[in-house]
């Protein structure tokens, strides 16, 4: 189980899209205990041969502090991810994405070596994909609770949003 809403949403989305997902993976075991880092979400789609490391964040830190934190996380990802999916031939490149809530891409299209994706853009992608899938014929599986909720909000948006006026 993910530690927060954003990690859970990202993990559900990639699982729903056919990826094998690892969450909150401690990597780089230290001799005296503990780990070098923790990778929030790592997803692999063997059919597409796509490997992605996602670090969602709700922080409002300075860009300098974010740069240091995400650089450390993404470097650990490049170092340790190749060992996480034993038995699979992984692609040589790992797509790395920082998903941010409180940010703008205008001055910061990348962070720590990864691409910046705003939560609004992720939500748009999800809503566009789910928007064409009626629950009666294409219900999101029940273990993807956030995605299923979004699917119902999309399906019943007129009734839902009319009550807010």
Predicted feature locations:
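Intrinsically disordered, low-complexity Ser/Thr/Pro/Gly-rich regulatory segments
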Residues: 1-165
């Amino acid at each position: 189980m993910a530690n927060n809403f954003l990690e859970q949403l990202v993990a559900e989305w990639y699982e729903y899209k056919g990826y094998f997902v690892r969450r909150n993976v401690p990597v780089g075991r230290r001799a005296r205990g503990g780990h070098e880092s923790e990778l929030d979400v790592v997803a692999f789609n063997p059919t597409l041969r796509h490997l992605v490391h996602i670090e969602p964040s709700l922080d409002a830190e300075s860009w300098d502090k974010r740069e240091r934190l995400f650089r450390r996380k993404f470097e650990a990802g490049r170092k340790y991810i190749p060992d996480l999916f034993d038995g699979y031939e992984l692609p040589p490149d790992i797509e790395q994405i920082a998903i941010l809530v409180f940010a703008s891409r205008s001055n910061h299209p990348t962070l720590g070596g990864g691409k910046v994706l705003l939560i609004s853009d992720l939500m748009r992608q999800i809503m566009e994909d789910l928007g064409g899938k009626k629950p009666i014929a294409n219900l999101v599986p029940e273990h993807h609770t956030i995605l299923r909720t979004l699917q119902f909000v999309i399906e019943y948006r007129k009734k839902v949003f009319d009550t807010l006026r």
